[in-house]
């Protein structure tokens, strides 16, 4: 009996010239724009070109909009970089939102509780350390359970997002100003205690931090021993064990790093961008 052949088969190309790769991506982008334009016209009756023009104007229409756009891109890129080591290890860390939010919460706690007790430079250092530790703990927990009991990291990290959300909601109610407002407003607005200094403008610091993170992450994954171990574990945990790599240690170490870097972005958001505690899915 002959095995039934599937109608479509997908196989990975060994090599693809850069020019052809760019042509394919450009064609896909063009098709996506055309398709979205058709859907927009059908649903709203508006000219898709005017809709695209409005989108571009909203993102790049003024110098401030350009700065906000690049700042937001930098934050998203930073969070993407944070989960890169885990994904390279094929540990599906879906908890970046919670790890970032717990960094925001740790930073906010330090700014509110220590704002009038220590100097701003010291407060910034304390807030940074607190956020990194909080993110490391948030990354450690699913990694430890995965390493010891082979739990499903996707569900574990996803569920921890909701814990971080509820903790954030709870402390927003505790610290809300004024009572009943459902938000805490700008933290230390009068003293600016714990605020990161502006470099050039309000948008440049996150961009510089993420640019530095990008370079360091490339070096870490491409040229360090840890990066090599992450790659081997990602390809095959059994092969990694045969090679003498302690897989459990690599899993835990990598997720601690991933959680800490997510929390670093939370620190930047709280002490340098929003200057408040919000759910990170809210618009800023």
Please provide the spans of the model-predicted regions.
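Membrane-helix interfacial "entry" motifs
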Residues: 9, 13-21, 60-68, 89-92, ...
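Hydrophobic core segments of alpha-helical transmembrane domains in multi-pass membrane transport
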Residues: 25-40, 79-83, 104, 108, ...
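Helix-loop-helix "hairpin" substructures at the membrane interface of multi-pass membrane proteins
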Residues: 199-274
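Residue-level detector of conserved catalytic or cofactor/ligand-binding positions
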Residues: 276-284
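Single transmembrane alpha-helix segments in multi-pass membrane proteins
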Residues: 40-44, 50, 54, 59-114, ...
